[in-house]
Regions:
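Short pre-active-site segment immediately N-terminal to the catalytic Zn-binding motif
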Residues: 93-108
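Acidic/histidine-enriched alpha-helical segments
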Residues: 11-18, 61-62, 164-178
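Single conserved hydrophobic/aromatic residue that forms the stacking wall/gate
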Residues: 195-206
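Post-HExxH zinc-binding segment in Zn-dependent metallohydrolases
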Residues: 119-121, 130-165, 183-187
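Extracytoplasmic/secreted envelope proteins and their assembly/folding machinery
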Residues: 6, 13, 38-45, 90, ...
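Solvent-exposed, acidic/flexible segments
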Residues: 2, 34-41, 97, 101, ...
Length: 206
């Protein structure tokens, strides 16, 4: 993680050195015009086929979190279907909070295509032994969805009108990756190395 963090920070420094305007664009992210979650998932499903094996027609639906639960749930989540039916494949979107539609687009890449929805349906089509459904790993499942977020940022570039769209989305992903590395280093430092959160100097050396 340290090497990934160092590499990402170096890349960001080089990008901002060559294009200082990217920093302003990063904080004032361009919006995707005519954005709709359903069309975004269709677009992601189409785009991912150049990087991942295509699925047969996959039925899914979008639902919205009830307002009574908006303050307690994630911005979006994929609801894993029952084992014996494999359906419905449902993505819930939380309309609470303020986020750009570009952020929602990349969140849908995490939850939908090529993220959790794709991961679950593809896995089911491999006809795994039943025991594989009993043994699961949150790190494995979330690791995949986080990994493919980088593709979501790439796919979003063609939907932005800015000439530097590819660089903007690449910088956004690097920023996301840096944050994930920092969170992970703090997590392992505090819970594995038992560094107390009140020891900022030691935490900084993780």
């Amino acid at each position: 993680m340290r090497s990934q963090l160092t590499e990402d920070m170096h890349t960001v420094q080089q990008m901002l050195k060559k294009q200082p305007s990217l920093l302003r664009k990063l904080t004032n992210v361009a919006e995707i015009k005519d954005f709709e979650p359903a069309s975004a998932l269709q677009y992601l499903n189409q785009q991912m086929q150049k990087d991942f094996p295509a699925l047969d027609t996959t039925d899914y639906e979008i639902r919205y979190v009830h307002e009574s639960m908006e303050d307690f749930l994630s911005p979006a989540f994929y609801l894993t279907p029952p084992l014996d039916t494999g359906s419905p494949n449902v993505i819930y979107i939380n309309r609470a909070g303020s986020r750009s539609n570009l952020e929602l687009f990349t969140t849908l890449s995490h939850e939908g295509f090529p993220g959790h929805l794709y991961q679950t349906v593809f896995f089911g089509k491999t006809q795994p032994d039943d025991i594989r459904y009993l043994i699961t790993s949150g790190g494995y499942v979330e690791g995949w969805a986080t990994y493919v977020e980088s593709y979501g940022y790439q796919y979003a570039a063609s939907l932005l009108s800015d000439k530097a769209a590819a660089d903007i989305t690449a910088l956004m992903w690097k920023n996301r990756s840096i944050n994930l590395c920092i969170y992970s280093l703090l997590d392992t430092g505090i819970h594995l190395s038992l560094i107390h959160i009140s020891e900022p100097t030691r935490l900084a050396l993780i």
